Amino acid sequence: MAISIVLVAKICFELSYDRCYEDSERIFKIKTAYSQQGHASEFGQVSGAVALGFKQYVPGVKSATRMTFIVDSERFTDEQGNILSGKMIIADSSWFDVFPTRILAGDPKSALGTSARAMVARSFAERLGGVQEAVGQLIENEELPGYKITVGGVFEDFPHQSSQRYDILLSMESYPRSSTENWLGNDRYRAYVRLEDGIDYKMLDPAIRLMQEKNQPLDELEKAGTELRYYLAPLAGEHSAESNVRNMLIILGIVALLMLAISLLNYVLYAISAMVKRSKEVGVRKCYGAGTGSIYSMMMREAALDVLLSLVVAALLILALRSVLGELAGVPVGALFVPVSYAVLALVVALVFIVAALVPARLYSRIPIASAIRNYKENKRIWKLALLFVQIAVCTFLVCLVEVIALQYDKAINDKPGYEYEQLAYANLRGTDASTHAALVERLRSVPGVEDVQMSYDIPLHGSSGNNVYLPGSERELFNIADQYEGTPGLFDMLGIRFTDGRYPQNLEEVAVSTGFLTRMAEFADWSDGAVGKQICLTGHPECSDILTVCGVYEDYRIGTLTDSDSRASVKFYAEIGVGFMPFLLVKLERMDREVLGQLNTLLDEAFPGRGLGFTAYKDTMREFYSNERKIRNTVMCGCVVCLLIAIFGLMGYVRDESERRSKEVAVRKVNGATSREILGLFIWEMVRISLVAIVLADIGAYFVGGLCLSYFAEKISLSPWIFISADLVVLGVVCATVAVNSLRISRSNPVESLKTE
């Protein structure tokens, strides 16, 4: 019951995402739909002026706001040098018009309208000394050394089911207007609008198009083969519409339903087992005038008490295991219980009570009055076997599901993404003095156990921003690529990324492209004689030559993760240490040795004292990127173990009842020469026959649900029959072992004891 309650609450929590704001149904996200040379795609970000344009040009838009990220680091220091942790974004002065919350101190319009000022959340303000005390204090992010941010006000934290849960909102005035007020390019902003009451967002498309025509060169874009339009999407449904979230909710819902079902089945099974013992009680009650209503009332009182006790125990378990359950859920357990959770849980408890009361009551009400004066022989064996059949099927289904999820998770964290990372560690030097990087690299290379040291704009696991490709002499943009930006010359050699043609760039006029780049370019130009030496142009690279020469073609490697893979072609540029923007320092070790990492961290701390920088094993970061998959695996595994235990208890009760019912039959068999092994085989074979049918049906269901689990991975394990066979053997083994252990007493009993009453 405890795990089921948490799972139901988790589902309600996810479904209530971004429904926590006042009139949340009127909040929409501005999205971009664009097409390049017939290839259509969607994007969740826009240029800086677009949100302001919606407010100015689109009737029915009450307010509009935008935000963007400015730093990766969450490490801040206050005036006393204390280290604080917080997530910071840049937001404009209309932020709280779209996302209202209680303002505890300061004027948000003034704070978010003044450069270098910020609004902070209550939880962050309390770490600065208190809500009122925080106002006026200065904080500094480690990636922006010397840039002092003044706290201008404090707002109440947004709840955990909000996608806008940030600690620090830095004013948009702190950012260059060339970025915040442009209509094309630099589409780094997430933009949101709040509509007037009664406005149908689907009817705003003509006004949105008119806004674009007034402010964007749409005709020129179309001539270049690019189509661009904006549309509104309800914010409240965005989170649950994501494929990985949707699949997770389906899996958690199935597990919660099966756990509740198997618990109820076990309750009914025990109620049926008790019928023989309680038949005289029911018969006597009927003799004294108890009707069907009285029997139903009695069973409902008993069920109410049992459900109440189970809820109390469940609450105590949740309280005791709140840290473990919070880790599985990804948020504090208390945060899961949003208002809708209580309503849904009340409905679930009511359904549990109805089934737990009415099914046994129906069976007990049919006990004849004669049972009060003679032995009641009805044993409901078919009922018991049917309930056990379902329990075994549920357990098999969950064991199969655990195996599928565990194998896919293992594949993900031991992935072969097209580059070598097993002995790789990295550190993010963003915000440090780039002129010191070259000396640091040389010092790191001298450490015993270090094989190589290189620098890069980013690591492949973090994904990639994009830019557009066009040919010299033409303004027609051909396609969008994943721009991996700069890296030092030895980077690809260190990562084991192989060149199929040419080499790594050696100056700012050269660029290396992926094999996927050639595939896309083949749609627009004839490069059949080779890509090396061909010339292209790219947007977003003012530091490079206007015309770039392709110097090499490298094999495609995965950018992102298996669950969020960037399938675009990619490019890579050259830069010198200390000149190009390359904040990521990558070190390849001869073997992943914590002692060597400690030496590297010491050198890093000496180079940048007080920054708290350190190296992270690449493989550890990869594991963290798949933390949601790990949590799903662990959740299903917990449900599987609990269901197996419940099924074992039910099976034990059934074997005990059958041993009593068939004691004389067993005694006669033993008198006629049957051995203990044959008696055990008798009980085991009966359950094996039932189990085989249940297992086959469970395997079929697990195959389809397992396929659903794998659907959002770029690379999947194959659903081999051996996965299901191994799961089947586990369940059969548990069934046979349980039956064997609980049949030992009857198989070894003295037949005289069972026959002496005859």
Mark where each language-model region is:
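Generic structural signal for small/hydrophobic residues in well-ordered secondary structure
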Residues: 7, 14, 30, 54, ...
